Swiss-Prot record:
Disulfide bonds: none annotated. Product of an upstream open reading frame of the genome polyprotein gene. Keywords: Host cytoplasm, Host cytoskeleton. It comes from Zika virus. The keyword Thylakoid does not apply. This is uORF protein. The lineage of its organism: Viruses, Riboviria, Orthornavirae, Kitrinoviricota, Flasuviricetes.
Amino acid sequence: MDLETRVSGHEKPQRRNPEDPDCQYAKTRSSPCKPLGRFEEVASRTSAGSWTHQNGFGDTSLFEIYSNQAITGPYQQMGFRGEKRGYGNNKEVQERSCCHVENNQC
């Protein structure tokens, strides 16, 4: 199973939060920006290479990162906190987390 299928298979249905109009939700994977809510933190590891987070709705979604690289720098600035490690593609993490926790700008 390729990364695209694994990631899309874990997605929750996307919906807008009426109380957070600045955080728009993209509907297609071809969109350059897919904010999934305010990313307060990356929660505990759930399985090899998989991590959970809660988005602005309190939904828990699953995503994967590669290369054992810490989520710091631009990823941390987009709302990820701490030194979370796993496997996956950091580009995918960035793509799926572009709603900034502080200003909701993509």
